[in-house]
Amino acid sequence: MRKSRDRVEQFPRPLSSIESKEGLRLDSGLGEMNRVLGGGIMKGSVALIAGEPGIGKSTLMLQLAAGIRSEGRVLYISGEESPVQIRLRADRLGVRDSRIEVFSETELSAMLRACGKLKPIVVILDSIQTVHSEDIGSVPGTVNQIKLCAQELIDWAKSHGAALFLVGHVTKEGYIAGPKVIEHMVDTVLYFDSGSAEIRILHCAKNRFGSVDEIGIFEMGEQGLRQVENPAAVFLSQRVGEQPPGVAVAPMYEGSRILLVEIQSLVVPAKGGISRVFSERIDSARVSRMAAVLEKHLKVRLSDQDIYVNVGGGIRISEVGVDLPLCLSLYSARINQPIPPLTAIVGEISLAAEVHPVGHLDRRIRAVQEMGFSRLISPPPKEQKLQVPEFCYPVSSLTEAARTGFQT
Protein backbone atom coordinates (compact mmCIF):
# COMPACT_ATOMS: atom_id res chain seq x y z
CA MET A 1 0.00 0.00 0.00
CA ARG A 2 1.26 3.48 -0.91
CA LYS A 3 2.29 6.01 1.68
CA SER A 4 -0.55 8.48 2.24
CA ARG A 5 -0.16 11.85 0.49
CA ASP A 6 0.55 14.97 2.60
CA ARG A 7 0.71 12.94 5.78
CA VAL A 8 2.23 14.57 8.87
CA GLU A 9 4.98 12.32 10.22
CA GLN A 10 4.26 11.11 13.75
CA PHE A 11 6.67 9.86 16.43
CA PRO A 12 6.08 7.84 19.61
CA ARG A 13 5.73 9.90 22.79
CA PRO A 14 4.94 9.12 26.44
CA LEU A 15 1.26 8.81 27.30
CA SER A 16 1.75 11.15 30.27
CA SER A 17 2.98 13.92 27.94
CA ILE A 18 -0.22 13.97 25.89
CA GLU A 19 -2.60 16.70 27.05
CA SER A 20 -6.28 15.77 27.22
CA LYS A 21 -7.23 19.03 25.52
CA GLU A 22 -6.01 17.47 22.28
CA GLY A 23 -9.26 15.52 22.22
CA LEU A 24 -11.64 18.48 22.50
CA ARG A 25 -15.03 18.13 20.86
CA LEU A 26 -16.75 20.49 18.45
CA ASP A 27 -20.36 21.52 18.98
CA SER A 28 -22.25 20.35 15.88
CA GLY A 29 -25.03 22.86 16.46
CA LEU A 30 -27.47 19.93 16.41
CA GLY A 31 -28.35 18.74 19.90
CA GLU A 32 -29.51 15.33 18.67
CA MET A 33 -26.27 14.78 16.76
CA ASN A 34 -24.21 15.80 19.80
CA ARG A 35 -26.21 13.34 21.91
CA VAL A 36 -25.55 10.40 19.58
CA LEU A 37 -21.85 11.22 19.16
CA GLY A 38 -21.35 11.37 22.93
CA GLY A 39 -21.17 15.12 23.45
CA GLY A 40 -20.11 16.55 20.10
CA ILE A 41 -17.72 15.94 17.22
CA MET A 42 -14.34 14.66 18.36
CA LYS A 43 -11.45 16.34 16.55
CA GLY A 44 -9.57 13.89 14.35
CA SER A 45 -12.41 11.36 14.46
CA VAL A 46 -13.90 9.54 11.47
CA ALA A 47 -17.61 8.77 11.25
CA LEU A 48 -19.48 6.68 8.69
CA ILE A 49 -23.13 7.71 8.31
CA ALA A 50 -25.31 5.27 6.40
CA GLY A 51 -28.92 5.17 5.29
CA GLU A 52 -31.18 4.37 2.38
CA PRO A 53 -31.01 6.66 -0.67
CA GLY A 54 -33.34 9.65 -0.22
CA ILE A 55 -33.63 9.28 3.56
CA GLY A 56 -32.03 12.70 4.18
CA LYS A 57 -28.32 11.99 4.76
CA SER A 58 -27.19 14.86 2.52
CA THR A 59 -29.65 17.22 4.20
CA LEU A 60 -28.37 16.19 7.64
CA MET A 61 -24.75 16.70 6.60
CA LEU A 62 -25.40 20.14 5.09
CA GLN A 63 -27.26 21.26 8.22
CA LEU A 64 -24.42 19.88 10.35
CA ALA A 65 -21.88 21.82 8.24
CA ALA A 66 -23.84 25.03 8.85
CA GLY A 67 -24.35 24.37 12.55
CA ILE A 68 -20.78 23.67 13.66
CA ARG A 69 -19.84 26.14 16.39
CA SER A 70 -16.28 26.92 15.37
CA GLU A 71 -14.34 29.51 13.41
CA GLY A 72 -12.69 26.92 11.17
CA ARG A 73 -13.71 25.97 7.67
CA VAL A 74 -15.92 23.05 6.70
CA LEU A 75 -15.18 21.28 3.40
CA TYR A 76 -18.25 19.67 1.83
CA ILE A 77 -17.19 17.30 -0.97
CA SER A 78 -19.94 15.87 -3.17
CA GLY A 79 -19.49 13.21 -5.80
CA GLU A 80 -23.20 13.12 -6.56
CA GLU A 81 -24.28 16.77 -6.86
CA SER A 82 -22.95 19.83 -8.66
CA PRO A 83 -22.18 23.04 -6.72
CA VAL A 84 -25.35 24.60 -8.16
CA GLN A 85 -27.48 21.70 -6.90
CA ILE A 86 -25.90 21.98 -3.45
CA ARG A 87 -26.56 25.74 -3.42
CA LEU A 88 -30.23 25.19 -4.34
CA ARG A 89 -30.60 22.71 -1.49
CA ALA A 90 -28.80 25.09 0.87
CA ASP A 91 -31.20 27.91 -0.10
CA ARG A 92 -34.16 25.65 0.66
CA LEU A 93 -32.68 24.81 4.06
CA GLY A 94 -31.79 28.42 4.81
CA VAL A 95 -28.07 27.62 4.92
CA ARG A 96 -25.92 30.65 4.10
CA ASP A 97 -22.54 30.18 5.72
CA SER A 98 -19.33 31.49 4.16
CA ARG A 99 -17.29 28.97 6.20
CA ILE A 100 -18.65 26.09 4.08
CA GLU A 101 -16.45 25.31 1.09
CA VAL A 102 -18.23 23.26 -1.58
CA PHE A 103 -16.25 20.95 -3.86
CA SER A 104 -17.80 18.69 -6.50
CA GLU A 105 -15.20 16.00 -7.12
CA THR A 106 -14.75 12.22 -7.27
CA GLU A 107 -10.97 11.86 -7.69
CA LEU A 108 -9.04 11.16 -4.51
CA SER A 109 -5.89 13.17 -5.22
CA ALA A 110 -7.95 16.30 -5.98
CA MET A 111 -9.77 15.88 -2.66
CA LEU A 112 -6.52 15.54 -0.73
CA ARG A 113 -5.08 18.63 -2.43
CA ALA A 114 -8.19 20.61 -1.48
CA CYS A 115 -7.92 19.38 2.11
CA GLY A 116 -4.25 20.37 2.26
CA LYS A 117 -4.94 23.83 0.85
CA LEU A 118 -8.01 24.72 2.95
CA LYS A 119 -7.03 22.91 6.17
CA PRO A 120 -10.67 22.43 7.25
CA ILE A 121 -11.68 21.42 10.76
CA VAL A 122 -14.43 19.16 9.34
CA VAL A 123 -14.56 17.29 6.02
CA ILE A 124 -17.82 15.81 4.73
CA LEU A 125 -17.69 13.36 1.81
CA ASP A 126 -20.99 12.51 0.11
CA SER A 127 -20.61 9.72 -0.76
CA ILE A 128 -17.73 7.29 -0.29
CA GLN A 129 -19.07 5.08 -3.14
CA THR A 130 -18.29 7.79 -5.70
CA VAL A 131 -14.60 8.23 -4.84
CA HIS A 132 -11.90 6.72 -7.01
CA SER A 133 -8.14 6.85 -7.28
CA GLU A 134 -6.37 6.82 -10.64
CA ASP A 135 -3.70 4.62 -9.06
CA ILE A 136 -6.19 1.78 -8.55
CA GLY A 137 -7.29 -0.09 -11.64
CA SER A 138 -10.98 -0.54 -10.88
CA VAL A 139 -14.21 1.42 -11.17
CA PRO A 140 -15.60 3.60 -8.33
CA GLY A 141 -17.64 1.73 -5.73
CA THR A 142 -15.63 -1.49 -5.79
CA VAL A 143 -14.23 -2.88 -2.56
CA ASN A 144 -10.62 -1.99 -3.40
CA GLN A 145 -11.48 1.58 -4.39
CA ILE A 146 -13.60 2.20 -1.29
CA LYS A 147 -11.16 0.62 1.13
CA LEU A 148 -7.97 2.25 -0.15
CA CYS A 149 -9.51 5.67 -0.81
CA ALA A 150 -11.07 5.66 2.64
CA GLN A 151 -7.71 4.78 4.21
CA GLU A 152 -6.03 7.74 2.48
CA LEU A 153 -8.72 10.14 3.70
CA ILE A 154 -8.66 8.69 7.21
CA ASP A 155 -4.87 9.02 7.38
CA TRP A 156 -5.12 12.68 6.38
CA ALA A 157 -7.89 13.42 8.90
CA LYS A 158 -6.08 11.70 11.78
CA SER A 159 -2.75 13.38 11.13
CA HIS A 160 -4.28 16.87 10.74
CA GLY A 161 -6.82 16.67 13.58
CA ALA A 162 -9.80 17.16 11.27
CA ALA A 163 -13.12 15.39 11.76
CA LEU A 164 -14.18 13.33 8.74
CA PHE A 165 -17.74 12.27 7.87
CA LEU A 166 -18.14 9.58 5.19
CA VAL A 167 -21.65 9.13 3.78
CA GLY A 168 -22.62 5.64 2.58
CA HIS A 169 -25.75 4.13 1.08
CA VAL A 170 -27.66 1.20 2.55
CA THR A 171 -29.13 -1.61 0.45
CA LYS A 172 -32.74 -2.84 0.64
CA GLU A 173 -31.57 -5.56 3.01
CA GLY A 174 -30.24 -2.91 5.42
CA TYR A 175 -26.55 -3.44 4.76
CA ILE A 176 -24.09 -0.65 4.00
CA ALA A 177 -23.36 -1.10 0.31
CA GLY A 178 -19.58 -1.16 -0.15
CA PRO A 179 -18.67 0.85 2.96
CA LYS A 180 -19.38 -2.21 5.10
CA VAL A 181 -15.73 -3.08 4.47
CA ILE A 182 -14.53 0.11 6.19
CA GLU A 183 -16.62 -0.14 9.38
CA HIS A 184 -13.58 -1.41 11.28
CA MET A 185 -11.51 1.53 10.02
CA VAL A 186 -13.74 4.32 11.34
CA ASP A 187 -14.37 5.50 14.90
CA THR A 188 -18.14 5.85 14.65
CA VAL A 189 -20.85 4.15 12.59
CA LEU A 190 -24.19 5.98 12.42
CA TYR A 191 -27.41 4.78 10.81
CA PHE A 192 -30.05 7.24 9.62
CA ASP A 193 -33.42 5.48 9.43
CA SER A 194 -37.00 6.39 8.68
CA GLY A 195 -39.31 5.96 11.66
CA SER A 196 -42.47 7.07 9.86
CA ALA A 197 -43.36 9.41 7.00
CA GLU A 198 -41.68 12.42 8.64
CA ILE A 199 -39.68 10.98 11.56
CA ARG A 200 -35.98 10.22 11.10
CA ILE A 201 -33.96 8.28 13.67
CA LEU A 202 -30.18 8.56 14.03
CA HIS A 203 -28.67 5.69 15.98
CA CYS A 204 -25.17 4.49 16.63
CA ALA A 205 -23.78 1.02 15.89
CA LYS A 206 -20.19 1.80 16.92
CA ASN A 207 -18.68 4.67 18.89
CA ARG A 208 -15.15 4.82 20.25
CA PHE A 209 -15.88 8.10 22.03
CA GLY A 210 -19.29 7.50 23.59
CA SER A 211 -22.26 5.23 24.13
CA VAL A 212 -23.91 3.23 21.35
CA ASP A 213 -27.27 3.35 23.13
CA GLU A 214 -28.20 6.96 22.35
CA ILE A 215 -30.57 7.85 19.52
CA GLY A 216 -31.33 11.17 17.84
CA ILE A 217 -34.83 12.00 16.64
CA PHE A 218 -35.56 14.43 13.82
CA GLU A 219 -38.62 15.45 11.84
CA MET A 220 -38.29 16.04 8.10
CA GLY A 221 -40.08 19.09 6.72
CA GLU A 222 -39.92 21.52 3.82
CA GLN A 223 -37.09 23.43 5.52
CA GLY A 224 -35.10 20.29 6.22
CA LEU A 225 -34.60 18.39 9.45
CA ARG A 226 -35.98 19.71 12.71
CA GLN A 227 -35.08 18.35 16.13
CA VAL A 228 -38.14 16.93 17.89
CA GLU A 229 -39.02 18.93 21.01
CA ASN A 230 -41.03 16.20 22.77
CA PRO A 231 -39.47 12.87 21.77
CA ALA A 232 -41.24 10.97 24.57
CA ALA A 233 -44.53 10.92 22.64
CA VAL A 234 -43.35 11.01 19.04
CA PHE A 235 -43.82 7.26 18.52
CA LEU A 236 -47.37 7.08 19.89
CA SER A 237 -50.31 6.83 17.48
CA GLN A 238 -52.74 9.74 17.56
CA ARG A 239 -55.83 7.57 17.26
CA VAL A 240 -59.42 8.55 17.99
CA GLY A 241 -61.55 6.06 19.89
CA GLU A 242 -60.78 2.77 21.60
CA GLN A 243 -57.36 1.16 21.44
CA PRO A 244 -57.48 -1.98 19.25
CA PRO A 245 -56.53 -5.47 20.50
CA GLY A 246 -52.83 -6.28 20.35
CA VAL A 247 -51.57 -2.78 21.23
CA ALA A 248 -49.58 -2.06 24.41
CA VAL A 249 -47.80 1.19 25.34
CA ALA A 250 -44.37 0.83 26.95
CA PRO A 251 -42.02 3.44 28.50
CA MET A 252 -38.66 2.34 27.09
CA TYR A 253 -35.25 3.57 28.23
CA GLU A 254 -33.26 4.50 25.13
CA GLY A 255 -29.82 5.97 25.76
CA SER A 256 -30.44 8.60 28.42
CA ARG A 257 -34.14 9.30 27.96
CA ILE A 258 -37.54 7.66 28.18
CA LEU A 259 -39.59 7.10 25.02
CA LEU A 260 -43.19 5.90 25.02
CA VAL A 261 -43.66 3.38 22.22
CA GLU A 262 -46.46 1.16 20.97
CA ILE A 263 -45.93 -2.59 20.82
CA GLN A 264 -48.29 -3.93 18.15
CA SER A 265 -49.09 -7.64 17.79
CA LEU A 266 -51.20 -9.68 15.40
CA VAL A 267 -51.90 -13.38 16.04
CA VAL A 268 -53.56 -15.44 13.28
CA PRO A 269 -53.88 -19.18 12.51
CA ALA A 270 -50.71 -20.56 10.94
CA LYS A 271 -50.81 -21.47 7.28
CA GLY A 272 -49.93 -25.12 6.78
CA GLY A 273 -49.90 -25.77 10.51
CA ILE A 274 -46.34 -24.45 10.99
CA SER A 275 -46.11 -21.48 13.34
CA ARG A 276 -43.88 -18.57 12.33
CA VAL A 277 -42.75 -15.33 13.97
CA PHE A 278 -42.38 -12.12 11.96
CA SER A 279 -40.71 -9.31 13.88
CA GLU A 280 -38.25 -6.67 12.64
CA ARG A 281 -38.19 -4.10 15.46
CA ILE A 282 -37.97 -6.59 18.34
CA ASP A 283 -35.67 -9.60 18.18
CA SER A 284 -37.59 -12.64 16.89
CA ALA A 285 -35.94 -14.88 19.50
CA ARG A 286 -37.33 -12.65 22.27
CA VAL A 287 -40.81 -12.80 20.71
CA SER A 288 -40.64 -16.61 20.48
CA ARG A 289 -39.46 -16.85 24.09
CA MET A 290 -42.29 -14.65 25.39
CA ALA A 291 -44.81 -16.63 23.32
CA ALA A 292 -43.58 -19.84 24.97
CA VAL A 293 -43.90 -18.29 28.44
CA LEU A 294 -47.44 -17.16 27.62
CA GLU A 295 -48.46 -20.59 26.36
CA LYS A 296 -47.01 -22.33 29.42
CA HIS A 297 -48.27 -20.03 32.17
CA LEU A 298 -51.42 -18.38 30.80
CA LYS A 299 -52.59 -21.47 28.92
CA VAL A 300 -53.12 -19.66 25.60
CA ARG A 301 -52.26 -21.72 22.55
CA LEU A 302 -49.78 -19.98 20.28
CA SER A 303 -47.86 -22.92 18.79
CA ASP A 304 -50.35 -23.16 15.92
CA GLN A 305 -50.45 -19.40 15.28
CA ASP A 306 -48.46 -17.02 13.11
CA ILE A 307 -47.21 -14.07 15.17
CA TYR A 308 -46.55 -10.61 13.73
CA VAL A 309 -44.93 -7.96 15.96
CA ASN A 310 -44.17 -4.34 15.17
CA VAL A 311 -43.12 -1.22 17.07
CA GLY A 312 -44.98 1.97 16.17
CA GLY A 313 -42.83 4.64 14.56
CA GLY A 314 -40.21 2.18 13.36
CA ILE A 315 -37.90 2.33 16.37
CA ARG A 316 -35.95 -0.81 17.33
CA ILE A 317 -36.28 -2.04 20.92
CA SER A 318 -33.71 -4.27 22.63
CA GLU A 319 -34.05 -3.52 26.36
CA VAL A 320 -35.46 -6.16 28.72
CA GLY A 321 -38.28 -3.89 29.90
CA VAL A 322 -40.16 -4.69 26.70
CA ASP A 323 -40.91 -8.26 27.88
CA LEU A 324 -44.08 -7.54 29.86
CA PRO A 325 -45.70 -5.14 27.34
CA LEU A 326 -44.84 -7.62 24.58
CA CYS A 327 -46.50 -10.46 26.50
CA LEU A 328 -49.66 -8.47 27.19
CA SER A 329 -49.74 -7.27 23.58
CA LEU A 330 -49.60 -10.89 22.35
CA TYR A 331 -52.17 -11.96 24.93
CA SER A 332 -54.48 -9.11 23.93
CA ALA A 333 -54.20 -10.05 20.25
CA ARG A 334 -54.80 -13.75 20.97
CA ILE A 335 -57.96 -13.26 23.07
CA ASN A 336 -59.05 -10.32 20.87
CA GLN A 337 -59.56 -8.01 23.84
CA PRO A 338 -57.97 -4.54 23.96
CA ILE A 339 -55.91 -3.33 26.88
CA PRO A 340 -57.81 -0.46 28.57
CA PRO A 341 -56.82 3.00 27.25
CA LEU A 342 -54.21 5.17 29.00
CA THR A 343 -52.45 2.07 30.34
CA ALA A 344 -48.65 1.81 30.13
CA ILE A 345 -46.71 -1.40 30.83
CA VAL A 346 -43.07 -2.21 31.58
CA GLY A 347 -41.16 -5.13 33.09
CA GLU A 348 -38.76 -8.00 32.47
CA ILE A 349 -40.19 -11.53 32.33
CA SER A 350 -38.29 -14.65 33.39
CA LEU A 351 -38.91 -18.11 31.94
CA ALA A 352 -40.81 -18.85 35.15
CA ALA A 353 -43.18 -15.96 34.30
CA GLU A 354 -41.86 -13.80 37.14
CA VAL A 355 -41.83 -10.03 36.63
CA HIS A 356 -38.38 -8.68 37.41
CA PRO A 357 -37.47 -5.04 38.19
CA VAL A 358 -36.18 -2.69 35.51
CA GLY A 359 -33.82 0.25 35.78
CA HIS A 360 -34.84 3.89 36.01
CA LEU A 361 -38.37 3.08 37.14
CA ASP A 362 -38.73 6.53 38.71
CA ARG A 363 -38.03 8.22 35.38
CA ARG A 364 -40.45 5.90 33.58
CA ILE A 365 -43.15 6.72 36.13
CA ARG A 366 -42.56 10.43 35.64
CA ALA A 367 -42.68 10.16 31.83
CA VAL A 368 -45.92 8.16 31.90
CA GLN A 369 -47.47 10.63 34.33
CA GLU A 370 -46.46 13.63 32.22
CA MET A 371 -48.09 12.09 29.15
CA GLY A 372 -51.42 11.78 30.98
CA PHE A 373 -51.61 8.00 31.42
CA SER A 374 -53.86 6.81 34.23
CA ARG A 375 -52.20 3.42 34.91
CA LEU A 376 -48.71 1.95 34.87
CA ILE A 377 -48.33 -1.81 35.27
CA SER A 378 -44.77 -2.45 36.39
CA PRO A 379 -42.61 -4.63 38.64
CA PRO A 380 -42.12 -3.60 42.27
CA PRO A 381 -39.34 -0.98 42.56
CA LYS A 382 -35.79 -2.14 43.25
CA GLU A 383 -35.20 0.88 45.46
CA GLN A 384 -37.10 0.53 48.74
CA LYS A 385 -37.15 4.31 49.19
CA LEU A 386 -38.95 4.90 45.87
CA GLN A 387 -42.47 6.17 46.50
CA VAL A 388 -44.82 4.53 44.02
CA PRO A 389 -47.77 6.77 42.99
CA GLU A 390 -51.34 5.53 43.23
CA PHE A 391 -51.66 5.09 39.47
CA CYS A 392 -48.87 2.45 39.54
CA TYR A 393 -49.86 -1.21 39.82
CA PRO A 394 -46.85 -3.31 40.90
CA VAL A 395 -47.09 -6.95 39.79
CA SER A 396 -44.77 -9.87 40.52
CA SER A 397 -45.98 -12.46 37.99
CA LEU A 398 -47.28 -12.61 34.44
CA THR A 399 -50.57 -14.05 35.67
CA GLU A 400 -51.07 -11.10 38.00
CA ALA A 401 -50.09 -8.68 35.22
CA ALA A 402 -52.64 -10.19 32.82
CA ARG A 403 -55.36 -10.00 35.46
CA THR A 404 -54.50 -6.40 36.33
CA GLY A 405 -53.89 -5.30 32.75
CA PHE A 406 -57.38 -6.03 31.51
CA GLN A 407 -59.24 -4.53 34.46
CA THR A 408 -61.15 -1.34 33.64
Stretches found by the model and what they are:
Residues M1-L37, M42-L48, I55-L62, A66, ...:
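Peripheral, non-AAA+ core regions of ATP-driven protein-machinery
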Residues E52, G79:
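P-loop (Walker A) phosphate-binding loop of NTP-binding proteins
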Residues S82:
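Conserved Rossmann-like nucleotide-cofactor binding loop
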